[in-house]
Regions:
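Thiol-based oxidoreductase modules, predominantly thioredoxin-like and allied folds used
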Residues: 116-131, 141-151
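Conserved redox-active cysteine motifs that mediate thiol-disulfide chemistry
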Residues: 92-112
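Thiol/disulfide oxidoreductase modules built on the thioredoxin-like
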Residues: 134-141, 148-198
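A short beta-strand-turn-helix
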Residues: 58-60, 65-88
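N-terminal targeting signals for export/organelle localization
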Residues: 1-69, 198
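Conserved hydrophobic/aromatic "anchor" residues
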Residues: 66, 78, 92-93, 135, ...
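Short pre-active-site segment immediately N-terminal to redox-active cysteine/selenocysteine motifs
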Residues: 86-88, 93-96, 161
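Hydrophobic beta-strand anchors of alpha/beta hydrolase catalytic cores
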Residues: 89-90, 120, 165
Length: 198
């Protein structure tokens, strides 16, 4: 069998990203792996203990606060600290990430279903602002979506996989995270528990 080139092998495991920012992606990914335990207090648990949502991790500790500009011009800044009192679904995405785009309709549907009870916030990083804005418009996402230009918030949350969804309790403490694409049913399972606890 012919040997694959280095570029072909890399493309099998890494989504295509904008060329100017690929080097930064590699740096924060390594740093995120090193910080995954310390940054957000990740504790791996079995799926059974988390309502059988595949790929979820239980989290401990307080969510790191941030204030970032919204991807869309003219909107107020996105400040996590101001969202306490209700659970928060924090979704990390990028315009070049296919699974991120596929899950957006489910996230939007759930944001409408739980309106007034749960906050939904997107965070785009390692991305171009214009491209991220276009994706939000194309997929009909209306909840706040922050622009993380230096990937600082992604590093704080030790994001290793795109997309990643972090669930935060009404008290501002981390609860769970889902690495990779999430479905509407999986969102309901976790969010219902958050709402019951708040």
């Amino acid at each position: 069998m012919p040997r694959r080139s280095e570029r072909e092998s890399r493309d099998l495991i890494e989504p295509e990203a904008p060329a100017p920012r690929r080097r930064r992606w590699g740096w924060w990914l390594v740093a995120g792996l090193a910080l995954v335990g310390a940054a957000v207090g990740v504790a791996v648990t079995t799926d059974d203990s988390l309502g059988k949502v595949p790929g979820t991790l239980k989290l401990t500790g307080e969510a790191k606060t941030f204030t970032l500009d919204d991807v869309r011009s003219g909107r107020p800044p996105v400040a996590l600290e101001g969202l306490r009192g209700r659970p928060v679904v924090l979704n990390f995405f990028a315009s070049w990430c296919g699974p991120c785009i596929r899950e957006m309709p489910a996230l939007q549907a759930m944001s409408e279903h739980y309106e007034g009870r749960v906050h939904f916030v997107g965070v785009t990083f390692n991305d171009r602002r214009e491209a991220a804005r276009d994706v939000l418009e194309r997929t009909g996402v209306t909840y706040p979506s922050a622009f993380d230009p230096d990937s600082d918030v992604a590093l704080d949350y030790a994001v290793r996989v795109m997309p990643t969804t972090v669930f935060i309790g009404a008290d501002g403490h981390l609860v769970e995270r889902k690495d990779g694409e999430i479905s509407e049913r999986q969102l309901r399972t976790v969010i219902d528990r958050l709402v019951d606890r708040s």
